[in-house]
């Protein structure tokens, strides 16, 4: 009976059980809880919940800090109305918009638990076909760059990937795929527009507060490719655009995708989570050093912490670089490049103009990618060989990868006049009695591979000099 339902108004699980059995008999009971939910939601939506005490709001309403009990009650009511929304679609038709508004417009005002409750409620509505995938994904994507919680980001990414996967399980869903890819393009392009005031690159603590929108776009697109859900030119175009992104993490992840490391974006995400703990420790020591008594021991601890953080980042970068060299490359994606010549020229321009800005590891990755694109598509970028010449020294860090990249870029259509100076530079620097046998072997093998790909680049006098080293392996 209705009286029996009223007895459970403060016991939401029991009331929920009754309402699910006979929704029409308990409409008034649900409406009472809905109105209670609405009153608490308006407090959150008005920004009152986290305002400073004593502040005044429009409409002569005084700002009141919401208590923990009220927050807990709101979370319970939110779960309650989401569970019963299919039974009362007319009453709860505004619920999806409420959840989206709370998550996107009042994200900073919500407690971590309330954010998760809103997300779970939205997922529940989506699973019960009350909201479309388009609405669901358009709400989740902006949250990736808003939230600072690694748990929340993991939940969001899993929900996004699973939703796209299920939509394409039986057959491709071109409408949804185009919509999501459009969102991802927008996320990357916003980071490349210097006039956009919302670009994450402008924030001083961008490296400490997690990934940018563009990095999440690269990660989602890479994951879709890895799962063989998206294998089209549009996905490749998105990742190709990210290869020249001004944010170093975004660029590195996109480049590593084309080099064959399909987990690059995911690894970059985990790395940023791990790195987030390092600067936090350094920042704590800096704060203690500022406000506390200045001692030599404290300064020494701070100096050691900074050195440890730098050393760890360098080790991670070098390890990732060596792993990338072992991959055969994502040739399927490279073959799908829409305009390989323009992509190669843009990539080389980014490499040469950012010569001082890029770290050596990033430069080597770009060299590797550029050489593979040139080899696969038979491209000719003349300035590439003169640029590479300055790195052709035995003592150069990562010289083996640089030599491999140079040789790999050569093909039968490469002009001989741009290769001859490079071969001479290698011969003079690597092939002479004053260096070790390993250095001579590296130089000879590189020259041998270049000549195998383009035999006409070898000059007779240089060949006669190199004959003495023909047994170097």
Which residues does each PLM region occupy?
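Alpha-helical repeat/alpha-solenoid scaffolds of the HEAT/ARM/MIF4G superfamily
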Residues: 166, 172-197, 212-349
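Alpha-helical solenoid scaffolds in large eukaryotic transport, assembly, and signaling factors
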Residues: 1-155, 159-176, 222-226, 240-241, ...
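Residue-level detector of extended alpha-helical repeat arrays and alpha-solenoid scaffolds
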Residues: 70, 74, 115, 153, ...
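Eukaryotic scaffolding regions of large macromolecular assemblies
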Residues: 348-361, 365-473
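Short inter-helical turns and helix N-cap capping residues of alpha-solenoid HEAT/ARM repeat scaffolds
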Residues: 70, 107-111, 145-149, 191-192, ...
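Short amphipathic alpha-helical interaction elements and helix-loop-helix interfaces
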Residues: 128-131, 146, 162, 166-169, ...
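Short, flexible/disordered secondary-structure transition segments
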Residues: 132-136, 151, 167-171, 195, ...
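Acidic, Ser/Thr- and Gly/Pro-rich intrinsically disordered linkers and low-complexity segments
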Residues: 45-68, 191-209, 431-435
